[in-house]
């Protein structure tokens, strides 16, 4: 990912060392190269998303320039700062350039441990440090979770040696942090900078102390966003060194300290540079996908074709009389496959589901609606009921269509039959071999002729004849 950075010098001074704090850059980490039209620029890494960039030449008031930031090897130049450390050492900072400046840190036994026990950073200027021409950029980088502490403070101090200190303390890992108004101790705190408005800090927290003349401007950055600015005066009136006693100890952590020549901050805008070109390429790919979709459409069409397959099965109906016994599965198929099947072919689509129900229905009565049937299955006697099958074939074709519609009318006319289909599936496996078995006991629920009348099939069949014949057979 690359970013475009526009720097607009809306100040009244020349600017060359630009401080950029932006969350977009944080995704690139420390491997960021900044370039203008002539190539890479010098830069100094502060923290993820926070950099100091040195322009090739000062930018005059009213001018603007556009540079880019992208992943790559940074062109680190420590001389950008008056002094700088890389955040990995607890020793005094290496001096870069002039004037003579030193930094003192208390991380458990360093130079000013006699003055305090706590978490703080101090910039000391025994000689040659002119606050009006310098600014301090501090980034705190925790290595471990801080111990139980109760407040956070950012303070500016001044004593006989012009000590300037930044003091920070955390609560629950910098969650729900409150700003402390005062620092207790034996020595007075001079012109403390009040940043109580900056509540609820979270790491990483970038503190930018800009010292210009007698005014100290503090900018607090959280995740690269400028939370706000407050100002306060400082004094060089002789005071004793400020006491930090009573603040407890904290876990060790790393910190980057950078002191820069003072310059006002120009307007900086960071925007992502995206390349949507590749996106459209995959778009056409989905277009061909719909083409294969129609192919499966014809596949369902053959589904009805297998339905007629059972049609030839009815012809050998007499022969398969014994066959049903071993194979209950095929039995239901032949029963609903009467010659008239072609006509109700469209209806058969739902037939597969009710197939078990019609099996018993066709055998007993074409005209009557079977509500409940109990069968006594006997193996050998099958041949004996030969006379029964004789009438059966005739009605068989008729019922076949009937079974298909039967499930439909049954629930409609008689509310009682509605539950009947539920039990019917249970006996269905038994009745499957109806032609093979001898029916010992049958209970029929005879419905008036009108029921079959709605079915076109019963009309051609002589209604009276089958009725009496079936009764005599039973």
From Swiss-Prot:
Sequence repeats: from-to residues: 368-377, 437-446
Stretches the record annotates as 3 Thr-Pro repeats regions and two near identical repeats: 278-467
Thr-Pro(N) repeats mapped onto the chain: 278-367, 378-436, 447-467
Record-linked InterPro entries: SelW_related (IPR051441)
Location of region: Disordered: 268-474
Presence of keyword Repeat: yes
Record keywords: Repeat
Compositionally biased intervals (Pro residues): 275-365, 380-434, 449-465
Listed name of the protein: Viral protein TPX
């Amino acid at each position: 990912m690359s970013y475009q950075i526009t720097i607009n010098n809306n100040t009244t001074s020349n600017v060359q060392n630009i401080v950029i704090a932006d969350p977009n850059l944080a995704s690139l980490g420390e491997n960021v190269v900044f370039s203008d039209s002539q190539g890479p620029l010098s830069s100094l890494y502060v923290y993820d998303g926070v950099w100091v960039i040195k322009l090739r030449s000062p930018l005059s008031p009213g001018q603007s320039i556009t540079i880019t930031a992208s992943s790559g090897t940074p062109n680190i130049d420590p001389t950008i700062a008056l002094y700088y450390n890389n955040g990995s050492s607890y020793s005094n900072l290496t001096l870069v350039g002039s004037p003579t400046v030193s930094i003192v840190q208390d991380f458990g036994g360093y130079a000013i441990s006699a003055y305090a026990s706590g978490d703080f950073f101090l910039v000391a200027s025994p000689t040659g440090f002119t606050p009006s021409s310098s600014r301090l950029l501090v980034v705190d980088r925790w290595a471990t979770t801080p111990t139980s502490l109760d407040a956070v403070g950012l303070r500016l101090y001044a004593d006989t040696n012009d000590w300037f200190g930044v003091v920070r303390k955390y609560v629950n890992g910098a969650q729900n942090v409150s700003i402390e108004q005062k620092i207790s101790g034996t020595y007075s705190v001079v012109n403390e900078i009040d940043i109580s408005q900056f509540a609820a800090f979270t790491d990483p927290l970038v503190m930018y102390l800009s010292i210009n003349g007698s005014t100290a401007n503090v900018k607090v950055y959280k995740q690269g966003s400028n939370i706000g600015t407050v100002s306060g005066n400082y004094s060089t009136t002789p005071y004793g060194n400020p006491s930090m006693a009573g603040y407890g100890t904290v876990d060790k952590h790393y910190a980057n300290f950078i002191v820069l020549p003072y310059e006002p901050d120009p307007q900086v805008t960071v925007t992502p540079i995206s390349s949507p070109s590749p996106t459209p390429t995959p778009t056409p790919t989905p277009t061909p996908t719909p083409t294969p979709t129609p192919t499966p459409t014809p596949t369902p069409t053959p589904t009805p074709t297998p339905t007629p397959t059972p049609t030839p099965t009815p012809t050998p109906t007499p022969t398969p009389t014994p066959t049903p016994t071993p194979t209950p599965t095929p039995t239901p198929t032949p029963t609903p496959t009467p010659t008239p099947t072609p006509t109700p072919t469209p209806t058969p689509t739902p037939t597969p589901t009710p197939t078990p129900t019609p099996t018993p229905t066709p055998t007993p009565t074409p005209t009557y609606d079977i509500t409940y049937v109990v069968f006594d299955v006997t193996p050998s006697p099958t041949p004996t009921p030969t006379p029964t099958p004789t009438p059966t074939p005739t009605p068989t074709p008729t019922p076949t269509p009937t079974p298909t519609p039967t499930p439909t009318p049954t629930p409609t006319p008689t509310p009682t039959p509605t539950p009947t289909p539920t039990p019917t599936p249970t006996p269905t496996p038994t009745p499957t071999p109806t032609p093979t078995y001898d029916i010992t006991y049958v209970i029929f629920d005879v419905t008036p002729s009108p029921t079959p009348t709605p079915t076109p099939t019963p009309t051609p069949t002589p209604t009276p004849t089958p009725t009496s014949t079936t009764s005599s057979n039973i």
